[in-house]
């Protein structure tokens, strides 16, 4: 991308931010005059048409309307959350410098590694070369979105992909239901209807979070003395540090996101192999409202529950599998055999003090989740819980730096030494004599010294 193309792309994003700011100013004026705000998409478009052409530089009408659609969706989403009782949900009232712009099918042109981004009437066309070719046919692409993340420009492509078609007798069976328990150490623990189970380990993701926090702390401590004071302009070295910080943050997000996609793909592939047609996923978002201390709140913030659920739902829907969110309350502290409450285990093994049942905590929870009813219902299992017998272990995040086996891991095979590893120091004499000093033994006569 040439500097001119980059400048024009950022100009489109800034113009979209101007559209967002104009909507905020109009609603602020209406609020001061005790008038209802403009929130509907149609009335916002009518207000936009009154501004006239050329108001927002090179941003065309389609791109400006996509910003209005984004504002309207954000407003109604906040209203829905407030109506449901979430007092922390806030309406969009803050200005944004760069706002993503979306263009729909028929307004842009895809030609191999190039794409023509539509601009305002009377301005030259903006052709941008892509880093790689779009992996979908042109007729399946429905929209493109220009956005900026970490100081880098991206083009998000939305395509209409058909649902997978299976041969007769090999597709997902709606009568086969599996339970999925979402966690931190194990992103997904799945219990199948026939006693099969899948355990996806995400310890590499946790290690990536810890390494990123340690690296961030070290970098901030190193440059804290050179940081500009409030009201001062940063030096060139400070700008370089900020650029490096954005690069590291973006790399960390991409690593974690790739590992999350690997975990969801592993679950969906396993479910397709087991012909599972319905996934009952435990909804753990209720724990976010519980105060759990500084350290555990950090783990919950790094968990990214919503993204894990969204990725799994998207991939399962594409494979023809239905996903239902169910209440997971008490699944990790209820015995699946005698249905009695037991102390929540601190480790990974759940043991019942009443019937002496023992099993993996996450897999037992997944087996109990499979019996729950979507949309509510009793938490006590109404049907027998199918306990997992054959467990398949999978790891995600092998591309992460901390994914290697620990040196203290007892499963680490002992190293084999093929001959000497190097020259000894000091080298032994050729005569075979020892280089150690002669020992002085006190019970020997002095003549023998």
Regions found by a protein language model. Name each.
Residues 1, 172-192, 312, 362:
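Gly/Thr-rich phosphate-binding beta-strand-loop-beta motif of the actin/hexokinase/Hsp70
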Residues 2-63, 436:
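Gly/serine-rich nucleotide phosphate-binding loop at the start of the catalytic core
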Residues 40-149, 302:
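Acidic carboxylate diad motif detector
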Residues 153-176, 350:
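A short acidic-Thr-Gly-centered motif at the start of a beta-strand
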Residues 157-165, 251-272:
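Phosphate-interacting basic helix/loop segments used at nucleotide- and nucleic-acid interfaces
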Residues 186-240:
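Metal-dependent catalytic core segments for phosphate chemistry
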Residues 267, 276-284:
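Short glycine-rich phosphate-binding loop at a beta-alpha junction
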Residues 297-299, 303-449:
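Positively charged, low-complexity nucleic-acid-binding target-recognition regions
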């Amino acid at each position: 991308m040439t500097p001119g193309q980059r400048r024009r792309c950022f100009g489109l994003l800034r113009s979209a931010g101007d559209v967002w700011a104009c909507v905020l100013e109009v609603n602020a004026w209406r609020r001061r005059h005790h008038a209802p705000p403009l929130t509907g998409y149609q009335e916002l478009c009518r207000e936009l048409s009154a501004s006239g052409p050329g108001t927002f530089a090179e941003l065309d009408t389609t791109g400006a309307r996509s910003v209005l659609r984004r504002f309207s969706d954000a407003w109604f989403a906040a209203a829905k959350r407030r109506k449901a009782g979430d007092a922390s949900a806030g309406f969009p009232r803050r200005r944004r410098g760069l706002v993503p712009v979306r263009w729909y099918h028929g307004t842009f042109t895809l030609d191999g590694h190039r794409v023509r981004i539509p601009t305002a009437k009377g301005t030259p066309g903006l052709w941008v070369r892509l880093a790689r070719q779009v992996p979908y046919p042109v007729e399946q692409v429905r929209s493109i979105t220009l956005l900026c993340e970490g100081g880098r420009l991206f083009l998000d492509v939305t395509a209409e992909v058909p649902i997978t078609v299976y041969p007769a007798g090999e597709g997902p069976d709606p009568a086969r239901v599996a339970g999925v328990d979402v966690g931190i150490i194990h992103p997904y623990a799945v219990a199948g209807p026939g006693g099969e189970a899948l355990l996806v380990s995400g310890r590499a993701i946790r290690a990536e979070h810890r390494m990123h926090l340690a690296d961030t702390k070290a970098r901030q401590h190193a440059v804290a003395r050179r940081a500009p004071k409030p009201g001062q302009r940063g030096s060139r070295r400070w700008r370089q540090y900020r650029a490096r910080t954005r690069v590291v943050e973006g790399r960390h997000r991409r690593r974690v996101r790739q590992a999350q996609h690997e975990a969801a793909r592993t679950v969906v592939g396993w479910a397709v192999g087991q012909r599972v047609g319905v996934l009952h996923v435990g909804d753990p978002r209720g724990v976010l409202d519980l105060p759990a201390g500084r350290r555990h709140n950090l783990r919950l913030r790094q968990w990214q529950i919503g993204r894990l659920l969204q990725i799994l739902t998207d991939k399962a829907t594409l494979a023809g599998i239905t996903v239902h969110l169910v209440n997971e309350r008490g699944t990790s502290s209820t015995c699946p055999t005698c249905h009695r409450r037991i102390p929540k285990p601190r480790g990974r093994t759940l043991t019942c003090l009443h019937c002496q049942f023992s099993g993996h905590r996450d897999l037992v929870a997944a087996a109990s989740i499979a019996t729950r009813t979507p949309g509510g219902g009793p938490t006590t299992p109404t049907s027998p819980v199918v306990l997992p017998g054959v467990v398949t272990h999978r790891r995600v995040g092998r591309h992460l730096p901390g994914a290697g086996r620990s040196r203290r891991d007892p499963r680490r095979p002992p190293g084999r030494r093929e001959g000497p590893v190097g020259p000894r120091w000091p080298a032994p004499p050729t005569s075979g004599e020892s280089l150690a000093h002669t020992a002085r033994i006190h019970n020997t006569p002095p003549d023998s010294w």
